[in-house]
């Protein structure tokens, strides 16, 4: 009886260790390349879908080292400042491409603003804001407002983001400690 209980405890511990390693490896994911718009690509949104890029940005989490790939035909993409984004003004772009396949490296935390080089395309919704997270930052957005259209004020308490950040970064550690605790507890149980 004791041997059977020991074997089942060891199997459970092994399974929990494997699960913890999978979770930890997912948390340590490296830089990613995001194709803007996924299968939709970089093009003028359909008339009733002008928020397609806002939805796309809100469904992804961007980090320093990631990159954005814009794939398009007979168009262009420009990185602009905040004013250029909201006014669809590409007269003074930070960077501009029209080669049909453009990649932008996300090399700093903060907001990146992208528009089509065509004013008409931009005003029809072909524009994108991407928020790049600080290292270990966990940022919860209002569910009704995607990150690409969230308010730009910094009025939130720095303590709130610091505590959220530390909670998010301690998750992999907690996942690794659970199997260790269970192993120790199971050996104590078996020894009695």
UniProtKB/Swiss-Prot annotation:
Domain Phytocyanin: 32-134
Propeptide residue range(s): 167-192
Keyword Hydrolase: no
Cellular localization per UniProt: Cell membrane
UniProt superkingdom: Eukaryota
Entry's Gene Ontology molecular function annotations: electron transfer activity
Chief location: membrane
Membrane topology: Lipid-anchor; GPI-anchor
Disulfide bond positions: 88-122
Transmembrane segments: none
Cellular component GO terms held in the UniProt record: plasma membrane; side of membrane
PANTHER family, A to Z: BLUE COPPER PROTEIN, EARLY NODULIN-LIKE PROTEIN 7
Role of this protein: May act as a carbohydrate transporter.
Family: Belongs to the early nodulin-like (ENODL) family.
Protein name, per record: Early nodulin-like protein 7
């Amino acid at each position: 009886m004791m041997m059977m209980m020991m074997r089942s405890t060891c199997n459970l511990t092994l399974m929990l260790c494997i699960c913890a390693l999978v979770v930890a490896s997912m948390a340590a994911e490296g830089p990613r390349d995001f194709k803007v718009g996924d299968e939709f690509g970089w093009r003028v949104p359909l008339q009733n879908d002008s928020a397609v890029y806002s939805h796309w940005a809100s469904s992804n989490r961007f980090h320093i080292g990631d990159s954005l790939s814009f794939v398009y035909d007979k168009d262009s993409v420009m990185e602009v400042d905040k004013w250029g984004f909201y006014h669809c003004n590409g007269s003074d772009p930070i960077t501009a491409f029209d080669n049909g396949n453009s990649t932008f490296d996300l090399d700093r935390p903060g907001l990146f603003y992208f528009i089509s080089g065509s004013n008409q395309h931009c005003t029809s919704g072909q524009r994108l804001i991407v928020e790049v997270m600080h290292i270990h930052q966990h940022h919860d957005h209002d569910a009704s407002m995607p990150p690409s259209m969230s308010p730009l004020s910094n009025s939130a308490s720095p303590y709130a983001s610091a505590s959220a950040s530390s909670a998010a970064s301690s998750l992999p550690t907690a996942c690794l400690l659970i199997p260790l605790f269970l192993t120790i507890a199971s050996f104590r149980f078996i020894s009695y």
